[in-house]
From Swiss-Prot:
Free-text function comment from the UniProt entry: Probably catalyzes the hydrolysis of L-ascorbate-6-P into 3-keto-L-gulonate-6-P. Is essential for L-ascorbate utilization under anaerobic conditions.
Any one GO CC term of the record: cytoplasm
Localization terms from the record: Cytoplasm
Family: Belongs to the UlaG family.
InterPro entries given in the database record: L-ascorbate_6P_UlaG, Metallo-B-lactamas, RibonucZ/Hydroxyglut_hydro, UlaG-like_MBL-fold, UPF0173_UPF0282_UlaG_hydrolase
UniProt record, GO biological process: L-ascorbic acid catabolic process
Classification of source organism: Bacteria, Pseudomonadati, Pseudomonadota, Gammaproteobacteria, Enterobacterales
Protein's UniProt name: Probable L-ascorbate-6-phosphate lactonase UlaG
Source organism of the structure: Shigella flexneri
Protein induction: Induced by L-ascorbate. Repressed by UlaR.
Length: 354
């Protein structure tokens, strides 16, 4: 059989997906985190892999799904939170724009799986399956009640799950995980399709969503999940030392308030007394596309007048950030390679080729 006749759609998908293969899995496994630091990698959306100086590995909000893939149904799902928010009927054109940079089924070394809330782009059945099948049988799944309910429904044993609410602290080796208040108002109107939100007092946020503060021996990381801006960030900043803060940023479509703006990101950094503020989530959805450089431009305008004590950092999906080594950098660039140029003699017809 000729090559073109033996190739199928399935063989094409298996040969190209996930786009990064196990490259990032291998990089994370090989990383030796120096004392007094922590390393983290952006997995897309709000997915983060955190590794401490003691070699503790935790992932939070690692999601391996996709967005819209067809024009087949022109209408939004009945009762969707965006429909409730803005009274819309048309399909939301949210296509996934970020490649898959980590293979969940190539994960072997992990000490905890966490989720901030139960929205589809923050918790993933494939990740749960991969960890259950390929990793140690004592890896905990940590999240608010709605997330634990999902995991148990997927088949994760109840004894492997830890329900957290604001004020709880979970120790995973040398990382201390503090569950803090979340400010994700969209989560409160994520309801069964037949349930009305109008005129009904919403249930509490604590069962639905939490923010996390990861305290490592080398520094602290604040993960805000899908939280909107809240004055309460200042309380968190008063109560905890926060080195790096991650915030969900995006260009909200007309009639929608679901992501923080550039001004919100700066207010969050100031309120938390953070040293570095990093936007995320803006990478993933085509209809929330936003330019993170806007945050830096606004920071430049305000920093001297308002005496900001933090800097913004513009990241790339799949990239590594090391605290405090990268604290004075403003932008990430993927490794460019070719650092070993001219370690062997070039093979060229003559030097003018150079």
């Amino acid at each position: 059989m000729s090559k073109v006749k033996s190739i199928t759609r399935e063989s094409w998908i298996l040969s190209t997906f996930p786009e990064w293969g196990s490259w990032l899995n291998e990089e994370i496994e090989q990383e030796q985190v120096a004392p007094g630091t922590f390393a983290m990698w952006w997995l897309g959306c709000t997915g983060i892999w955190l590794k401490s100086e003691g070699g503790t590995n935790v992932c939070v909000d690692f999601w391996c799904g996709t967005g819209k893939q067809s024009h087949g149904n022109p209408l939004m799902k009945q009762g969707h939170q965006m429909q409730r928010m803005a009274g819309v009927k048309k399909l939301q054109p949210n296509l996934r724009t970020t490649p898959f940079v980590l293979d969940p089924f190539a994960i072997r070394q992990i000490d905890a799986v966490l989720a901030t809330h139960d929205h589809n782009d923050h918790i993933d059945v494939n990740v749960a399956a991969a960890v259950m099948q390929n990793c140690a049988d004592d890896v905990p799944f940590i999240g608010p009640k709605t997330c634990v309910d999902l995991w148990i429904g997927w088949g994760v044993p109840k004894e492997r799950c830890i329900v957290v609410k604001p004020g709880d602290v979970v120790k995973v080796k040398d990382i201390e995980i503090h569950a803090l208040d979340a400010f994700d108002r969209t989560a409160l109107i994520t309801l069964p399709a037949d349930q009305k939100a109008a005129g009904v007092l919403p249930d509490g946020m604590d069962d639905r969503a939490v923010n996390y503060l990861f305290k490592t021996p080398g520094g602290s990381l604040y993960h805000s999940g899908d939280s909107h801006y809240s004055n309460y960030y200042a309380k968190h900043g008063n109560e905890h030392q926060i080195d790096v803060a991650l915030g969900s940023y995006g260009e909200n479509p007309r009639g929608i308030t679901d992501k923080m703006t550039s001004a919100d990101m700066l207010r969050m950094g100031e309120a938390l007394n953070a040293k570095v503020v990093i936007p995320f989530h803006h990478d993933i959805w085509s209809n929330f596309q936003a330019d993170p450089q806007e945050i830096r431009v606004l920071w430049e305008i305000k920093k001297d007048r308002l005496k900001y004590g933090f800097k913004p950092f513009i990241w790339q999906v799949g990239g590594k950030f090391t605290w405090p080594l990268d604290k004075d950098n403003f932008e990430y660039h993927y490794p460019r390679g070719f650092d070993d140029c001219f370690t062997i003699e070039p093979d060229l017809p003559f030097k003018s080729f150079l």
